[in-house]
Amino acid sequence: MKKRADPRKIKREEHKQKLSKLQERVDNFGEDEADKEVSKFEELPLSEATIEGLKNSHYVTCTDVQKRAIPPALQGHDLLGAARTGSGKTLAFLVPVLECLFRNKWSDVDGLGALVISPTRELAVQIFQVLRKIGRCHSFSAGLVIGGKDVAMEADRLAKLNILICTPGRLLQHMDQTSGFDLSNVKMLVLDEADRILDMGFKKTMDAILENLPVDRQTLLFSATQTKSVSDLARLSLADPKYISANPDTTSSTPKNLEQNYVCVELQDKLDTLWGFLRTHTKFKIIVFFSSSKQVRYVYETFRTLQPGIPLLHLHGKQKQGARMDVVSKFSKASSSCLFATDIVARGIDFPAVHWVVQVDCPEDAATYIHRVGRSARFGKSGKALLFLTPTEEPAMIQRLEAKHIPINKLTIRPNKKKSIKNQLQALCFKSPEIKYLGQKAFISYYKSIFIQKDKEIFQFEKIPSEAFAESLGLPGAPQIKLGKSAEKMKEEANAKKNQSRALQKLMRAGDDGVVSDDEKEVRTKMDRMFERKNQNVLSDHYLNMVKGDADEDEETGDFMTVKRQDHNLESDDDEDIANLPTSKRAAKQALSKKQSLKNKGLGTKTLFDDEGAPHALYEFDDEEDFKAAGPVESQVKEFVDRETKDMEEADVGDKELVKQKRAEKKRKRKEIERLRELDEYDEESEEEGDSEEEQAAKKPKWFQRDESSDEEEDDGVLEVEEPTTLEDLESLTSKLLKK
């Protein structure tokens, strides 16, 4: 009797055979000429679960970068992928991640197998959402680790993850704090927007992360502007990397369907131009880029008050994570809206159907320009881009763009489209000290952003019109700016502070034993928080910073503009008030009486002020010496008479003109009354004539005015009358018959 086969064993054997066939297809892919003309995901050597996930997510056709990057990534090569914005780079590295773990039979007990690092939180969330869609048919566990979330909750789940999508700062924090977080089994490392991650801002963080990763891993780098720096590639320990470039025949890095233009405007006219643009594009979806978060907040708060007629949103790195995700969701769903943002949404974020990308501040280089305009014209759709350049920035920046083969045209603004809002901004700053403070911070942050730029040919710091720019923001004058350090050092410190984890900063403040000081660990109750509660509006912190008087001037990282309050010696009236207090009930009653209080106050005095602001009494008399010094009495009298005569003549001219105007107005009113009266009389006459005609028509016609109907009645020979009842009726009937 034969032994029955185990179905689980048969299933395992079938799975092994499928894996071996799939591995064979991957190894041999590209040898046949037909493999080079792949157009669909089904034609690639992918697992059934991945193909099914792509189909369910409506991904059927491969883009150029996907069919060039996926096969070598499946074969285990390190890649440097460069493609236009909106060309599908996310799928180009997520599909190899799933296939790598699937062919290695990865399970929960194997730990973390793939690591995807993104420079911004919003981009990491977007990558995670795409991974959930295409990987739904696999059994891998994936997680998202970004700043702004609960660290303890993330730490509990890290040990069970197979695929981790994260930002550099939060990943390094978990590597330092979370026990059991092991990166020794990582098979694949993916850096999205690699040129941004490898720059100076993330240098220390990325070096610490790379030290803990295995050397034999596979590394994929993707960006629209890829780095080829030897030092960067050496840091990543790439082994014979392959450079993948989509559309190598074309030279431009921007989408073909993107219409790119620029306008040359003065710095002080930028907000006026932006206002006019928004007023004429209220039915479009627009992203407006600024160089700093302070400028974003100022423009958002002021434009929101002025109401340009289009929904406004703002997004910058100083917002809480929940607020940032809410703004991204609202803008993605909106059909017409304007988003004021910094460069945190310049890379990788896919906002659907963006019509316009407006860059109010000049980008630092051509690569930043490419990433910004890439938010529009994605996946073959059309879009438009507009760049604001000052006359000093225009020549050098256009040269940089032409060197990258970026086609851009110059536009001129119609005079009828220009509208100045300087007066409105000045009124807002005058009414609200919070808006004024935001304007000061926006002014300073713009100056700092220009000062720290490397390309001094484009950004000429000394040629900025400070007073005119401050006036355009509604400020009474240009704030003072402290720039004690070099531009390179300031930029390095700003990037390090911006990208460093706040939790790591807290650990750095701990002692040698790793214990944080008691002051920072002090328990604060609900009652303490209630008494510490301050003004709850969005600008309360800025207002407090403006009015506080104990700021440290030597603090280099603090605010540039703070109002210093100085103590003055004030005369105290407490002693007089105590002396005037009533001593009895009667005196207290008299003190409450208005009549009695007026007796004690005495007579009031009237003071006049001259043109210089000096006070004078209402009547001032000259001394005898002053009177004699002015000259003889006769000459003074003559001068006085002449002066008064001249004043009276000038006043007489005005009085005559006023009387003339009053007479003309009186005459005009009289004629108007007469005209109205004539119209009323004419209307009455016309009505009377109409009434008389009706009366005549109602009268009985004469014998010679009889109509046809009366003739017909007479021709009948019949006279219809009522039955006579009296003698008078009989007499009248007799007379009628005789007449007939």
Swiss-Prot record:
Belongs to the DEAD box helicase family. DDX10/DBP4 subfamily. One of its GO terms (cellular component) is nucleus. Its EC number is 3.6.4.13. Keywords: ATP-binding, Helicase, Hydrolase, Nucleotide-binding, Nucleus, Ribosome biogenesis, RNA-binding, rRNA processing. Residues 1-37, 565-740 are annotated as: Disordered. PANTHER family: RNA HELICASE (PTHR24031). The Q motif is unique to and characteristic of the DEAD box family of RNA helicases and controls ATP binding and hydrolysis. ATP binds at residues 83-90. Interacts with the U3 and U14 snoRNAs. Associates with pre-ribosomal complexes. Residues 680-695, 709-731 have a biased composition (Acidic residues). It is found in: Nucleus, Nucleolus. This is ATP-dependent RNA helicase DBP4. GO terms for biological process: rRNA processing. CDD domains: DEADc_DDX10, SF2_C_DEAD. It comes from Yarrowia lipolytica (strain CLIB 122 / E 150) (Yeast). Residues 70-244 form the Helicase ATP-binding domain. PROSITE patterns: DEAD_ATP_HELICASE (PS00039), HELICASE_ATP_BIND_1 (PS51192), HELICASE_CTER (PS51194), Q_MOTIF (PS51195). A motif (DEAD box) lies at residues 192-195. Residues 257-421 form the Helicase C-terminal domain. Pfam families: CTE_SPB4, DEAD, Helicase_C. InterPro entries: DEAD/DEAH_box_helicase_dom, Helicase_ATP-bd, Helicase_C-like, P-loop_NTPase, RNA-helicase_DEAD-box_CS, RNA_helicase_DEAD_Q_motif, SPB4-like_CTE. ATP-dependent RNA helicase required for ribosome biogenesis. Involved in the release of U14 snoRNA in pre-ribosomal complexes. Required for pre-rRNA cleavage at site A2. The lineage of its organism: Eukaryota, Fungi, Dikarya, Ascomycota, Saccharomycotina.
